[in-house]
């Protein structure tokens, strides 16, 4: 009987974890992309595959390892409470004008949400800074007197046209790109937004 029980335990231990008992992980679904880049900050927006709590970590672009020291964290929060959801908006502030920074986006899946009573979060996941360099961003200089922006409109969901229009942006580096209107024929879902132009905007402009 003991041998049978021992073999049963060994067999169960060798089985892969059932999806029903495995913890969900929040991965990046779309983005990131930047908005409202000012002399002292910027806003990062992205979506995740499941409800999550999110934050952004920043470091100066000074050649050091991103985690050489503990980096400041900026949370997606409102009135001191962290927002939970699939769409994340994090404002990074307190930066210096005319300086280049690196940033990393992070998120933790919501395992249990009991409202004001308790929220249980899973393991943290984020943009891969081992295989790819952290995302760069440069704050505008305080003494500049001109800027360059590009405007795109009326592509009506033709992502290939959008990519042609902004394809040279990584080389020419406009200060920002204005997405003006009629970029889709209709907006039925977040997926349509990313497939229509936002995925390409994130790839080419971030």
Where are the predicted features?
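Positively charged n-region of N-terminal signal peptides that target proteins for export
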Residues: 1-4
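Acidic, histidine-bearing metal-coordination/catalytic regions of metal-dependent phosphoesterases
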Residues: 21-151, 156, 170-171
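Hydrophobic alpha-helix-in-membranes signature
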Residues: 15-18, 173
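Bacterial N-terminal signal peptides
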Residues: 6-16
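Active-site neighborhood of divalent metal-dependent phosphoester/pyrophosphate hydrolases
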Residues: 108, 112-116, 142-206
């Amino acid at each position: 009987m003991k041998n049978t029980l021992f073999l049963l335990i060994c067999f169960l231990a060798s089985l892969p974890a059932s999806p029903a008992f495995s913890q969900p992980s929040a991965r990046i679904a779309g983005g990131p992309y930047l908005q409202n880049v000012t002399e002292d900050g910027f806003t990062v927006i992205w979506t995740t595959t499941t409800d999550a709590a999110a934050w952004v970590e920043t470091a100066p672009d000074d050649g050091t390892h991103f985690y050489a020291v503990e980096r400041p964290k900026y949370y997606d929060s409102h009135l001191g409470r962290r927002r939970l959801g699939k769409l994340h908006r994090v404002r990074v502030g307190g930066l210096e004008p005319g300086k280049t920074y690196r940033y990393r986006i992070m998120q933790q899946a919501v395992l249990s949400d009991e409202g004001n009573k308790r929220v249980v979060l899973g393991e943290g996941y984020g943009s891969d800074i081992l295989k790819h360099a952290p995302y760069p961003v440069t704050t505008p200089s305080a003494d500049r007197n001109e800027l360059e922006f590009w405007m795109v409109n009326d592509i009506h969901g033709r992502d290939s046209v959008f990519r042609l229009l902004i394809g040279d942006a990584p080389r020419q580096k406009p200060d920002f790109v204005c997405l003006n209107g009629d970029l889709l024929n209709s907006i039925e879902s977040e997926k349509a937004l990313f497939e229509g132009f936002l995925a390409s905007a994130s790839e080419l402009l971030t």
